[in-house]
A protein has these predicted regions:
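Donor nucleotide-activated moiety binding/catalytic core segment of transferases
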Residues: 185-222
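Leloir-type glycosyltransferase catalytic cores
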Residues: 62, 251-263
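Short beta-strand scaffold positions
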Residues: 164-166, 227-228
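A donor-sugar binding/catalytic signature common to diverse glycosyltransferases
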Residues: 12, 17, 21, 212-255
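Secretory-pathway glycan-assembly enzymes, especially type II membrane glycosyltransferases
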Residues: 2-161, 172
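Catalytic lobes of large eukaryotic enzymes
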Residues: 150, 160, 170-198
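Short active-site oxyanion
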Residues: 158-162, 222-225
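Alpha-helix capping/helix-boundary segments
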Residues: 168-171, 231-232
Length: 263
């Protein structure tokens, strides 16, 4: 059997995940079984570990005596068009199996959220420096005040609870102060200022990956999400085709790069 070996990178978790899932399509087009090996990433505790297998079941079996392995250099990012959301959803459903212990944690949070929860993803910290990595100025974070205005509008129409996913301690405090016990969130590593969680903070790398994966999966099971430009929220949209969203970078800055998921 011939395999396509898909490696990791030093990018953030869902940048790496998005590229990996996109590369499953390359495997299909070449009639190869994908084999994912995430080594020397930001999320392995040991450089010899396969971090993919911390979080997901391996996509295919591998027998070094029988299998021929082809390496794919880099990742395949699908184009920004509506069919990409449908195709990413198909690839996730076909190839991605989240570890049961992680699914159990997600299910517990979703149960506590009740019916039709509102998801809010507020990406701050090093996202303020996104222009240094090739993003436009319009991709910088939207203010918490504007997020709160959109949350208020949504909560006027329902008594839903709010799941907040954020990398920023100050954002967490501001949202708790405003919405009290309607806010549910996870216990995870958060930062302040412009410090990146995955580049600048110490801590268990494996846990950092699990925490952002749980955030994404819970967001994907909400009724509607309020988001900015981020692969975390984008992948939540890929996971669930029924999920709707408000992209505040698009609404307030005309940054339409992720509008294809709403087409």
């Amino acid at each position: 059997m011939s395999k396509l070996l898909i490696g990791g990178s030093t990018a953030g978790f869902f940048s790496m995940f998005r590229g990996t899932v996109g590369t499953f399509l390359i495997a299909e087009q070449n009639e190869l079984d994908p084999l994912v090996v995430w080594q020397e990433t930001l999320y392995d505790n040991n450089k010899f570990d396969n971090a993919w297998e911390y979080y997901f079941e391996q996509v295919s079996d591998y027998d070094m005596r029988k299998d021929r392995v082809h390496r794919y250099s880099g990742h395949n990012i699908l184009p920004r068009e509506y069919n990409t959301r449908v195709e990413m959803n198909r690839l996730i459903n076909k190839y991605v199996r989240v570890k049961q212990e992680i699914e159990d944690k997600v299910s517990h949070i979703v149960s506590d959220l009740g019916e039709n929860p509102l998801g809010v993803h507020i990406r701050m910290t090093d996202k303020h420096n996104c222009t240094k990595h090739g993003e436009p100025e319009t991709g910088k974070p939207i203010s918490v005040k504007l997020y709160q205005e959109h949350v208020d509008e949504n909560l006027e129409q329902s008594d839903s609870k709010v799941f907040l996913a954020t990398d920023d301690l100050d954002v967490l405090e501001a949202m708790k102060e405003r919405y009290g016990n309607r806010i549910l969130t996870t216990e995870c590593i958060r930062s302040t200022g412009y410090k990146s969680i995955h580049h600048d903070l110490e801590g268990n790398n494996r846990e950092k990956g699990e925490q952002v994966l749980i955030d994404c999966l819970v967001l994907s099971r909400c009724k509607h999400i309020i988001k900015g430009i981020s692969n975390v929220a984008l992948c939540a949209m890929f996971w669930n085709l029924d999920l709707t969203c408000e992209n505040l970078n698009s609404i307030h800055r005309n940054d339409t790069r992720e509008d294809f998921v709403n087409a």
